[in-house]
From Swiss-Prot:
Species annotation: Streptococcus thermophilus (strain ATCC BAA-491 / LMD-9)
Top-level taxon of origin: Bacteria
Protein name as catalogued: Large ribosomal subunit protein bL35
GO biological process, one term: translation
Cystine residue pairs: none
Keyword set includes Ribonucleoprotein: yes
Matches recorded under Pfam families: Ribosomal_L35p
Compositionally biased tracts (Basic residues): 1-16
Gene behind this protein: rpmI
Amino acid sequence: MPKQKTHRASAKRFKRTGSGGLKRFRAFTSHRFHGKTKKQRRHLRKASMVHPGDFKRIKSMVSQMR
């Protein structure tokens, strides 16, 4: 049986935390900031954790990632 390979696009978007969680960065941060409030822009800077409903699927894609 062949080895399971890491999904490279996912590996670039998610980082493992020390406790085993997955950290992600927020969407809507590349352009068109004039339509967003200062508060929205500030909150978009912070990373967040992957939602539990998506965790199992994403974990299998990045299973080999440390």
